[in-house]
Amino acid sequence: MATVVAFHAHPDDETLLTGGTLAKLSAAGHRTVIVVATDGHMADLDGRKPLRLGELAASAAALGVHRVVHLGYADSGHGAVLYADPPDRMRFARADPEEAAGRLAAILREEHAEILLSYDRNGGYGHRDHVRVHQVGKRAAELAGVSRVLDATLPREGYTRLVRSLERLRVPFRYDPSVLASLFSPRSAITHRIDVAAQAAQRKTALAAHRSIVEGSSRFATIAKVLLRLPTPILARVMHWEWFAEEGATPGSGAPLDDIFLPAPR
């Protein structure tokens, strides 16, 4: 059996991008580990236990994940302003990439990881912490000698259609059309498409674990509320697939593979 490490920016990111794949791997007997760069909090915790890390632990348990590790950073936020660091920790966007990569590499070595799941170079929807996850993840794999890095992503063309459909339904989910052209990855870059329909119930439970976010008013909360209202069989159809782009693979080299342990052509 293999060990797969999924590197994420914030608690809740694991549910939509890799939740089904992690649940599927765990059920098959593989060891799965989530490493989260930030605790998801912007402010000073003043000695309090990070609420969102507790939610992540519940989400990971629903997915069957064996271990969760926090790298120790604070959320950097997604707005135009990068705020000052809280007194007790550094924002991930300000962290020295080499130091952060060293922390992640130590975990990869300890776990004897065979595959690292990370993010695409655009950071998906462009959050500064997601972009940094791509940079740090790629470097950590080099340091730890992990030869295969799969970037969790979405096919840009499908995501664009989804956003436009939501706008037509008057769901408050807006993107500048010029920004849509640089989100996630073009379909030609997708190397793996994993069928996770059977993991819909686990993903739903994992998503619901992030109550502090689901009950909010963010873009993620808008998506989460819609998904959680769906009956599980419908959710299985909506969230049927998870997509990955393998680092170093030849773009457009054929139909996406259906198993992350199958290497993409280089």
Locate each region found by the language model:
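Metal-dependent de-N-acetylase/amidase catalytic core
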Residues: 1-5, 83-84, 94-266
